[in-house]
């Protein structure tokens, strides 16, 4: 590979910010706290997206303060082989085939594939997949953290439990309460489908369970025999978890580890996009700028994209109107500054970020209680024009879609993917990948494989000229997101260069990228539809 591209990217990034040499390190003149911004790079691929769903009308310069911790100007002529590039891209990938049945009918989810590529260190994105034991509904979530990973980690671990409890019948909730009261094992709530690389906080699970119990006690008081509807459950779960995150840091906590972790969770933030699939019923809840789309194949074979979410940011006209309705007219000009909420945050909805939700007095009182704020990765000041909080909400927008045979796959991803690729680009890439892999790969579970069959399939693939660099669809999307030029063409040199950027430089060119592709079982969907 030519080193020209990687050398140009490094020098371009370095020249964006005036640097001062200090000892044997390089420092930026700009403020070094990247938490003042949740920046997003902009790709021309997004220009076709509607403004009403929150996509920017044009590009803007990336502004990211960083400290380059290397010694002098290094020789940045790094070279990766295609095999090394693929190894880096595939390090976080995962795939899972769903074998569950519901009343004798195979699950409407056939399989799902995911991957994650970090730009931050440590990565601030999280993901989650679980089956609700009581309802057999499957839940998929993408959680994009900012100001650190603590909030995204907490939401990824806890949100599905709130959702599962919300859907429980009154009788099941009574059984949960009785078991807890008598110190007996709880009924199974979730069946997690974890990736080996998923991290788990174990130190504060008892605190979390206490708050979850308070929630199901309140649900018991409502005396709803069948539990909340799925839409209600999603709305309640998002807002209740965010409220508990806020309350946990206000309550006195004796344990220092728990106290400081709760502080980090509350003062960092996370956007979230969550899908719940049960038979033909697909619900998607979104708060922030993660995104979910459906890939649809019409009867004539043509493919189209069906967006299921809208980005909650400064380019979403409906979101701007909501903010203006919730605050005095005198603040109309200061709600959004430089395309950010109060000039600080890109998304207008998120978990955590209590510094955009609490009053100034409450913030001062909480932070004055002896917390360890030295290492806390939070905003160091209250934004200007902070008059009528809260300015930020975790209330999601919920979309319902009844699955049809033509609905083939669902893509959920953090904004790191959508910064680089438009909705239609993603569908096109998934379909192209299916034509290269899915239609030419024997399904060993469906028919016996022998050498003759394998040879026939290999000859078919060779004759058609089709091949794929990746078996995992999410990996395929990430490869094209960071390796394609402005014309959508893959450039191996660009791809390798983007993967060899130092951590502090990489964040100027791309965000953490987390992608999940859920494939539906068309035959099962047909069966569910016939059964009504």
Swiss-Prot record:
Query: In the record's cofactor note, how is the cofactor described as bound?
Result: Binds 2 magnesium ions per subunit.
Q: Which GO terms describe its cellular component?
A: mitochondrion
Q: Give the E.C. number(s).
A: 3.1.3.43
PPM-type phosphatase domain: from which residue to which, for each copy? 107-518
- Give residues annotated as binding Mn(2+) 1: 144-145
Domain of life, per UniProt, equals: Eukaryota
Q: Which cofactor does this sequence's record say it needs?
A: Mg(2+)
InterPro entries reported for this sequence: PP2C, PP2C_BS, PPM-type-like_dom_sf, PPM-type_phosphatase-like_dom
Which compartment or compartments is the protein found in?
A: Mitochondrion
Q: Which residues bind Mn(2+) 2?
A: 144, 415, 511
Catalyses: O-phospho-L-seryl-[pyruvate dehydrogenase E1 alpha subunit] + H2O = L-seryl-[pyruvate dehydrogenase E1 alpha subunit] + phosphate
Give a Pfam family name. Answer: PP2C
Q: Which CDD domains match?
A: PP2Cc
Q: Which GO terms describe its biological process?
A: T-helper cell differentiation
What are the UniProt keywords, alphabetically? Hydrolase, Magnesium, Manganese, Metal-binding, Mitochondrion, Protein phosphatase, Transit peptide
Question: Which GO molecular function terms does the record list?
Answer: [pyruvate dehydrogenase (acetyl-transferring)]-phosphatase activity; metal ion binding
Segments passing through the bilayer: none
Q: Where is the transit peptide?
A: 1-69
Enzyme class, top EC level, equals: hydrolase
The UniProt entry's sequence similarity note says:
Belongs to the PP2C family.
Task: List the PANTHER family.
Answer: [PYRUVATE DEHYDROGENASE [ACETYL-TRANSFERRING]]-PHOSPHATASE 2, MITOCHONDRIAL (PTHR13832:SF343), PROTEIN PHOSPHATASE 2C (PTHR13832)
Q: What does this protein do?
A: Mitochondrial enzyme that catalyzes the dephosphorylation and concomitant reactivation of the alpha subunit of the E1 component of the pyruvate dehydrogenase complex (PDC), thereby stimulating the conversion of pyruvate into acetyl-CoA. Acts as a crucial regulator of T cell metabolism and function, with a particular focus on T-helper Th17.
Q: What is this protein called?
A: [Pyruvate dehydrogenase [acetyl-transferring]]-phosphatase 2, mitochondrial
Q: What is the lineage of its organism?
A: Eukaryota, Metazoa, Chordata, Craniata, Vertebrata
Gene expressing this chain: Pdp2
